[in-house]
UniProtKB/Swiss-Prot annotation:
One of its GO terms (biological process) is peptide biosynthetic process. One of its GO terms (cellular component) is cytoplasm. Gene3D superfamilies: 2.30.30.30, Nucleic acid-binding proteins (2.40.50.140). This is Elongation factor P-like protein. SUPFAM superfamilies: Nucleic acid-binding proteins, Translation proteins SH3-like domain. One of its GO terms (molecular function) is translation elongation factor activity. It comes from the Bacteria. InterPro entries: Elong-fact-P_C, NA-bd_OB-fold, Rib_uL2_dom2, Transl_elong_fac_P/YeiP, Transl_elong_KOW-like, Transl_elong_p-like_YeiP, Transl_elong_P/YeiP_cen, Transl_elong_P/YeiP_CS. Disulfide bonds: none annotated.
Length: 188
């Protein structure tokens, strides 16, 4: 698979190891005829040691086939997150490093996740596109605030902060996009 086709969360073989791509930066050439380069921030799977590498857009990487199991968040055990397989009730434990920044989107009862397995051991987590989280703290709506469409910060039950419209109040449940971290609307 070409480096330009890789996405965040992809698992690749590189330099005699298996790595998950956590961040991708694209750099465009400054002059004529330059090649587009991709800089990947990767973490070893399992283990979590960080590696940064740059690739040309046409450079080939070997994608590793993952087994994906649908699971729901069960509980937190210290720094580890435990997920329950929806089909056979197997428990999968992922440490905080494997979860990474996604920890802010994981709340009690979260379902629709996919635990990614290599050789039957859990290595990564794929969240649903949107999650429902409760607003625990946000400033009150200003009078006339709906006319200006000013966003305001809102602290969510998991500890992360997102920008929300003025009309959102403390205690409301909202949709949050897990890819961008942006407000996605009120939860029904």
């Amino acid at each position: 698979m070409k480096a330009s086709e890789m996405k965040k969360g992809s698992i690749v073989e590189y330099s005699n190891g298996t790595y998950q791509i956590r961040d991708i930066q694209r750099s465009s050439p400054q002059g004529r005829g330059g090649n587009v380069r991709f800089r990947f921030v990767m973490y070893s799977v399992p283990g979590g040691s960080k590696l940064e590498a740059s690739f040309d857009a046409d450079e080939m990487l070997t994608a590793v086939e993952l087994l994906r199991r649908e699971a729901s968040f069960s509980y937190k055990d210290g720094e580890a997150f435990v997920f329950l397989d929806e089909e056979d009730y197997t428990l999968y434990t992922l440490d905080a490093e494997a979860i990474g920044d996604n920890a802010g989107y994981i709340s009690e009862g979260l379902s629709g996740c996919y635990v990614q397995l290599i050789d039957a051991s859990p290595v990564a987590l794929q969240l649903p596109q949107h999650v429902v989280l409760e607003v625990v703290d946000t400033p009150p709506e200003l009078k006339g605030g709906t006319a200006t469409k000013r966003p305001k910060p809102a602290k969510l039950i998991t500890g992360i902060e997102v920008m929300v419209p003025e009309y959102i109040t403390t205690g409301e449940r909202i949709l949050v996009n897990t890819t961008t971290g942006a407000f996605g609307g009120r939860a029904s």
